[in-house]
Amino acid sequence: MLILTRRVGESLHIGDDIKITLLGIKGNQVRIGIDAPRDVEVHREEIYDRIRRETRKANRRTAEETLDQASRLLSQK
């Protein structure tokens, strides 16, 4: 993990397209601004974790449905 120190108003870049700026500090909270292309998804960790869980559930359901359909097709022959 790369650890950097920034002051309010300072930025860092990830690649050519992503810029992260430290906007402010209030107590134990830090406000950051993220400038990234629209095709780059940016999520808070708790939202990202929820998306991953829901995607896994959906993939499991899809796999189960596919197996059920294949089983029905095979039993018809």
Swiss-Prot record:
It comes from Magnetococcus marinus (strain ATCC BAA-1437 / JCM 17883 / MC-1). HAMAP family: CsrA. It comes from the Bacteria. Its main location: cytoplasm. InterPro entries: CsrA, CsrA_sf. NCBIfam families: csrA (TIGR00202), PRK01712.1 (NF002469). This is Translational regulator CsrA. Keywords: Bacterial flagellum biogenesis, Cytoplasm, Repressor, RNA-binding, Translation regulation. GO terms for cellular component: cytosol. The gene is csrA. It is found in: Cytoplasm. GO terms for biological process: bacterial-type flagellum organization; mRNA catabolic process; negative regulation of translational initiation; regulation of bacterial-type flagellum assembly; regulation of carbohydrate metabolic process. A translational regulator that binds mRNA to regulate translation initiation and/or mRNA stability. Usually binds in the 5'-UTR at or near the Shine-Dalgarno sequence preventing ribosome-binding, thus repressing translation. Its main target seems to be the major flagellin gene, while its function is anatagonized by FliW. Residues 58-77 are annotated as: Disordered. Belongs to the CsrA/RsmA family. Homodimer; the beta-strands of each monomer intercalate to form a hydrophobic core, while the alpha-helices form wings that extend away from the core. Residues 68-77 have a biased composition (Polar residues). One of its GO terms (molecular function) is mRNA 5'-UTR binding.
